[in-house]
């Protein structure tokens, strides 16, 4: 394709709010254009890359007998009310109302709709298992869209849904999909690591995320260097081994702590290590207030709280609620209280006595507080985030951290949706049973961004061969010169029969063409320049920067060999 005919609006400067390198490069190279916050158009080069990504996805889905369908993005509220997610999903669900007053949502996911499609059709165990997938735009009303395609309000996803008669069948499809995802990310050029994860608003009993390693990733991966252990930090279990630091029990004292609001400020004020301070936070669990205690250097993990209490209906109490409940602001909370409120403490609080806690009075704290004498803990548990260097639950070593971009996730849903939506089948005994489900997502547009995030240098994008918008970049330095133009035209006609060629025939300065070529990042470049009359051209590899002069008689062989050896 001739570059003069392709819409590639490259930029010299990008908006300052473009934080991620992938966002900057996708804008700068003319692949995407922002419409409004979190919403982008995919221009010709990006569309070609997306087509290559989705072709790989379709191949791998067909390989495991997943059948493609296409469902509407617009979903009626009644389906979401059946599953209970209309109210539970929260403000990220894009809701709208038609002229007749009916409520709809622009789907962020399609569990309800696909369940409604199959519930009257998959009637017998003989029809199972069945796996359906689609590739479609999804919508999420992000509070703060950022990082370009990584966290947008409209995005492209591949979502698949499987239906089973028993858990063994679900296990097999889950493993098939897990392996397919591993192949997909390897084929598109992403270093992605599967990690144990939380199922979030989708629900289910078991899930893995596929994380593309990246410094700008919004998720923290906990992993072992001694085993294949990897988990999202939200799910990484903290191993508790008692290490009591009990000293002689002291008398409780109330001390004045003016303008002290954080654990670190309190530790500095008292001249004590922050891990000897105990923080108190108040949560509402299904409408009931509870206190949760952790040591000063630890952070409460609300995902673990949701898992522990078996509900998603958990939220941190507001400042007004806290003041009304205990008469003090959040920085002064403590477990010594004369109100009926259950107290839960992280396991590691057990290692201390003579605790330092808030006095439930602004400007004051209590020292030498002891469990059993001054207050009681209802239950201990793992309620916090793991720290780097702590022991891992698989006994393989210690926790190491890396940042990652979630590009895919696989879920075992069980009967969460089929039971609430009455999707049943007859088993081999003729008894009605709820369909057992799995769901599996890949962020297609996120994958595009993650590829760029992992495959670039200071000059621009470096496309992997499998997804590159074009295979070769043919550049005529000066098309006004007959020998250069004629040779470039001839090479374009020859190579375009075997490769996808982007032919830069523009009347632009050589520097502009080279800068754009580096920015766009096609794997191989053929430059027709001043030695055109001799039949000599330059061949350059984008990844390594290696270049050589080649006679046109040898050019097809050289290019074919280099292309075959590309990653």
From Swiss-Prot:
<dbReference type="InterPro" id="IPR006195">
    <property type="entry name" value="aa-tRNA-synth_II"/>
</dbReference>
<dbReference type="GO" id="GO:0005829">
    <property type="term" value="C:cytosol"/>
</dbReference>
<dbReference type="InterPro" id="IPR044140">
    <property type="entry name" value="ProRS_anticodon_short"/>
</dbReference>
<comment type="subunit">
    <text>Homodimer.</text>
</comment>
<dbReference type="Pfam" id="PF03129">
    <property type="entry name" value="HGTP_anticodon"/>
</dbReference>
<keyword id="KW-0030">Aminoacyl-tRNA synthetase</keyword>
<dbReference type="InterPro" id="IPR002316">
    <property type="entry name" value="Pro-tRNA-ligase_IIa"/>
</dbReference>
<keyword id="KW-0963">Cytoplasm</keyword>
<comment type="function">
    <text>Catalyzes the attachment of proline to tRNA(Pro) in a two-step reaction: proline is first activated by ATP to form Pro-AMP and then transferred to the acceptor end of tRNA(Pro). As ProRS can inadvertently accommodate and process non-cognate amino acids such as alanine and cysteine, to avoid such errors it has two additional distinct editing activities against alanine. One activity is designated as 'pretransfer' editing and involves the tRNA(Pro)-independent hydrolysis of activated Ala-AMP.</text>
</comment>
<keyword id="KW-0067">ATP-binding</keyword>
<dbReference type="GO" id="GO:0004827">
    <property type="term" value="F:proline-tRNA ligase activity"/>
</dbReference>
<dbReference type="GO" id="GO:0140096">
    <property type="term" value="F:catalytic activity, acting on a protein"/>
</dbReference>
<keyword id="KW-0547">Nucleotide-binding</keyword>
<dbReference type="GO" id="GO:0006433">
    <property type="term" value="P:prolyl-tRNA aminoacylation"/>
</dbReference>
<dbReference type="InterPro" id="IPR007214">
    <property type="entry name" value="YbaK/aa-tRNA-synth-assoc-dom"/>
</dbReference>
<keyword id="KW-0648">Protein biosynthesis</keyword>
<dbReference type="InterPro" id="IPR036754">
    <property type="entry name" value="YbaK/aa-tRNA-synt-asso_dom_sf"/>
</dbReference>
<dbReference type="InterPro" id="IPR023717">
    <property type="entry name" value="Pro-tRNA-Synthase_IIa_type1"/>
</dbReference>
<keyword id="KW-0436">Ligase</keyword>
<dbReference type="InterPro" id="IPR001387">
    <property type="entry name" value="Cro/C1-type_HTH"/>
</dbReference>
<dbReference type="GO" id="GO:0005524">
    <property type="term" value="F:ATP binding"/>
</dbReference>
<dbReference type="InterPro" id="IPR045864">
    <property type="entry name" value="aa-tRNA-synth_II/BPL/LPL"/>
</dbReference>
<dbReference type="InterPro" id="IPR033730">
    <property type="entry name" value="ProRS_core_prok"/>
</dbReference>
<dbReference type="InterPro" id="IPR050062">
    <property type="entry name" value="Pro-tRNA_synthetase"/>
</dbReference>
<dbReference type="GO" id="GO:0002161">
    <property type="term" value="F:aminoacyl-tRNA deacylase activity"/>
</dbReference>
<dbReference type="Pfam" id="PF04073">
    <property type="entry name" value="tRNA_edit"/>
</dbReference>
<protein>
    <recommendedName>
        <fullName>Proline--tRNA ligase</fullName>
        <ecNumber>6.1.1.15</ecNumber>
    </recommendedName>
</protein>
<dbReference type="InterPro" id="IPR036621">
    <property type="entry name" value="Anticodon-bd_dom_sf"/>
</dbReference>
<dbReference type="InterPro" id="IPR004154">
    <property type="entry name" value="Anticodon-bd"/>
</dbReference>
<dbReference type="Pfam" id="PF00587">
    <property type="entry name" value="tRNA-synt_2b"/>
</dbReference>
<dbReference type="InterPro" id="IPR002314">
    <property type="entry name" value="aa-tRNA-synt_IIb"/>
</dbReference>
<comment type="similarity">
    <text>Belongs to the class-II aminoacyl-tRNA synthetase family. ProS type 1 subfamily.</text>
</comment>
<dbReference type="InterPro" id="IPR004500">
    <property type="entry name" value="Pro-tRNA-synth_IIa_bac-type"/>
</dbReference>
<dbReference type="GO" id="GO:0016740">
    <property type="term" value="F:transferase activity"/>
</dbReference>
């Amino acid at each position: 394709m001739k570059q003069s005919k392709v819409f590639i609006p490259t930029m010299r400067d990008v908006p300052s709010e473009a934080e991620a390198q992938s966002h900057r490069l996708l804008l700068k190279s003319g692949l995407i254009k922002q419409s409004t916050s979190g919403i982008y158009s995919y221009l010709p080069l990006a569309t070609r890359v997306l087509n290559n990504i989705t072709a790989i996805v379709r191949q791998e889905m067909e390989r495991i007998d997943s059948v493609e369908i296409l469902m509407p993005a617009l979903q009626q509220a009644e389906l979401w009310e059946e599953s209970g997610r209309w109210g539970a999903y929260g403000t990220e669900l894009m809701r709208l109302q038609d002229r007749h007053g009916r409520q709809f949502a622009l789907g962020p996911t399609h569990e309800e709709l696909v369940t409604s499609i199959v519930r009257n059709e998959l009637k017998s165990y003989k029809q199972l298992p069945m796996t359906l997938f689609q590739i479609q735009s999804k919508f999420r009303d992000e509070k703060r869209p950022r990082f370009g395609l990584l966290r947008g309000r409209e995005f492209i996803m591949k979502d698949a849904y499987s239906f089973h008669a028993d858990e063994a069948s679900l296990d097999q499809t889950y493993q098939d999909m897990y392996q397919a995802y591993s192949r997909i990310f390897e084929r598109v050029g992403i270093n992605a690591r599967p990690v144990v994860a939380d199922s979030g608003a989708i629900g289910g009993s078991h899930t893995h995320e596929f994380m593309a390693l990246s410094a700008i990733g919004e998720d923290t991966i906990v992993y072992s260097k001694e085993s294949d252990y990897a988990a999202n930090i939200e799910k990484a279990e903290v191993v508790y081994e008692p290490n009591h630091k009990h000293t002689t029990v002291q008398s409780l004292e109330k001390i004045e702590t003016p303008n002290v609001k954080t654990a670190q400020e309190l530790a500095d004020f008292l001249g004590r290590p922050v891990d000897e301070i105990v923080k108190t936070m108040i949560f509402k669990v299904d409408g009931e207030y509870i206190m949760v205690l952790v040591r000063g250097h630890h952070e409460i993990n609300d995902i673990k709280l949701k898992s522990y209490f078996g509900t998603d209906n958990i939220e941190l109490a507001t400042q007004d609620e806290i003041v009304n409940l205990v008469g003090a602001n959040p920085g002064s909370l403590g477990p010594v209280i004369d109100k009926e409120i259950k107290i839960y403490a992280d396991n590691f609080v057990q290692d201390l006595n003579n605790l330092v806690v808030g006095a439930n009075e602004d400007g004051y704290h209590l020292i030498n507080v002891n469990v059993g004498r001054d207050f009681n803990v209802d239950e201990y548990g793992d309620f916090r985030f793991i720290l780097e260097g702590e022991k891992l639950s698989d006994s393989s070593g210690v926790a190491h951290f890396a940042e990652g971009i979630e590009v895919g996730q696989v879920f075992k849903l069980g009967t969460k949706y089929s039971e609430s939506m009455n999707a049943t089948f007859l088993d081999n005994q003729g008894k009605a049973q709820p369909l057992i489900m799995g769901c599996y997502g890949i962020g297609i547009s996120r994958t595009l961004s993650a590829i760029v995030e992992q495959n670039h240098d200071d000059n621009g994008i470096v496309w992997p061969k499998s997804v590159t918008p074009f295979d070769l970049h043919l550049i005529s330095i000066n098309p006004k010169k007959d020998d250069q133009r004629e040779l470039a035209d001839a090479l374009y006609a020859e190579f375009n029969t075997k490769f996808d060629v982007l032919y830069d025939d523009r009347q632009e300065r050589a520097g502009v063409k080279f800068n754009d070529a580096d920015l766009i990042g096609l794997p191989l470049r053929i430059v027709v320049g001043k030695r055109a009359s001799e039949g000599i051209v330059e061949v350059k590899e984008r990844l390594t920067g290696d270049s050589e002069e080649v006679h046109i008689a040898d050019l097809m062989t050289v290019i074919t060999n280099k292309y075959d050896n590309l990653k």
